[in-house]
């Protein structure tokens, strides 16, 4: 599915396109020593994945994060992988963050180091797992995107109701 990417920034991509892997957002306020230092950063295109090795309660061995926000650059400390087969971006965003799927793979392709896990690239690339057809990936990805959209809408509605409740309580007990 993926191949390791070692494509470096040729200097044409500035800090305005720096992507923080932890939150998958563009982060412009990072300080770099020079424009030359930006050439040590990897290019990180839509559909690429990067490994973040921090252990958490949700991700025992670290996690992969898929770039779904736009082409940019990431620090050279992250392993970046580029897709080599056609696949559905939305499906893989959910699949690579599914601990049930990835735990077995990452337990065999990472090694513990100080405060985090390091990915052993060759071990990861030698892992295999069953993948749905492209058509199934599209349906599954769309389903979860729709579900996320519904959750967001209900969260907004809940916030508005909380504000309304607070206002009513304030007026009632004046």
PLM feature segments, named:
Residues 1-174:
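Feature detects amphipathic, helix-rich regulatory segments
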